């Protein structure tokens, strides 16, 4: 008989890793834009997006490696929330994620934006909502749902190849980002969105909270639930059906 899987443990040191990676993530994204539009002078040219995607793939591989090397630190609140929900870690893990890890990521992202703005004053002000709040919430929520579905599915399948897993998720995230970039910026990261909004001074508006927090958080919950439901072993599904029949009788 195989041993029962161990329940996820609370690892306090991940808070430091979350803060550092969140700061580095916003800096990396801003530096890529500076290089493409400023250093290479590709602003407004078709090849600009191709170069951005190529550079994004490079640093997404780097951050995936950093996440693995740190034992699970992350730059995205949606990633740690999805992991906590999918692992069924219990109230302690959920509370640690909500009140320690996610705030650390937000603080890290804010510090990262401040650092990049001080170093490069012409870095810009981040992505903004270009449509109505409800339209934007639908777009950001749908984009998040699609990314979470793929990420959680790959994790549940326990794909051993780091390269293939990272390649699939990176290509998928970049595709969804491009499709939603003209609507909400395709951020799919509440910490990064908050950091840039904080720098602009519009981080407490209803539109920001709805589009970049409520919609993606709800989409994450729905995505984890959907993957968990559709990837349940057949025996468990049949057992639940039988139990329901017995109750009705």
UniProtKB/Swiss-Prot annotation:
It is found in: Membrane. Its main location: membrane. Aquaporins contain two tandem repeats each containing three membrane-spanning domains and a pore-forming loop with the signature motif Asn-Pro-Ala (NPA). The gene is SIP2-1. One of its GO terms (cellular component) is membrane. Signal peptide: none annotated. A motif (NPA 2) lies at residues 189-191. It comes from Zea mays. Pfam families: MIP. One of its GO terms (molecular function) is channel activity. It comes from the Eukaryota. It is a multi-pass membrane protein. Gene3D superfamilies: Glycerol uptake facilitator protein. Aquaporins facilitate the transport of water and small neutral solutes across cell membranes. This is Aquaporin SIP2-1. Keywords: Membrane, Repeat, Transmembrane, Transmembrane helix, Transport.
């Amino acid at each position: 008989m195989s041993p029962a899987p161990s329940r996820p443990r609370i690892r306090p040191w991940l808070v430091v890793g979350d803060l550092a990676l969140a700061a580095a993530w916003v800096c990396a994204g801003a530096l890529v834009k500076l290089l493409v539009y400023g250093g290479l002078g590709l602003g407004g040219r078709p090849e600009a997006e191709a170069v951005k995607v190529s550079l994004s793939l490079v640093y997404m591989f780097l951050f995936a490696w950093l996440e693995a090397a740190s034992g699970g630190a992350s730059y995205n609140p949606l990633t740690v929330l999805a992991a906590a929900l999918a692992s069924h870690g219990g109230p302690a893990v959920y509370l640690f994620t909500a009140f320690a890890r996610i705030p650390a990521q937000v603080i890290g992202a804010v510090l990262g934006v401040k650092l990049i703005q001080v170093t490069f004053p012409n870095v810009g002000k981040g992505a903004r909502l270009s449509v109505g709040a409800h339209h934007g919430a639908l777009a950001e929520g749908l984009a998040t749902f699609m990314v979470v579905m793929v990420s959680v599915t790959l994790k549940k399948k326990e794909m051993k190849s780091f390269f293939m897993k990272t390649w699939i998720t990176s290509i998928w995230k970049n595709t969804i980002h491009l499709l939603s970039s003209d609507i909400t910026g395709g951020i799919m990261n509440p910490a990064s969105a908050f950091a840039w909004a904080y720098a602009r001074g519009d981080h407490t508006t209803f539109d920001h909270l709805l589009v970049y927090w409520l919609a993606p958080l709800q989409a994450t919950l729905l995505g984890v639930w959907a993957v968990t439901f559709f990837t349940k072993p057949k025996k468990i599904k049949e057992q639940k059906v039988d139990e329901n029949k017995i109750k009705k009788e």
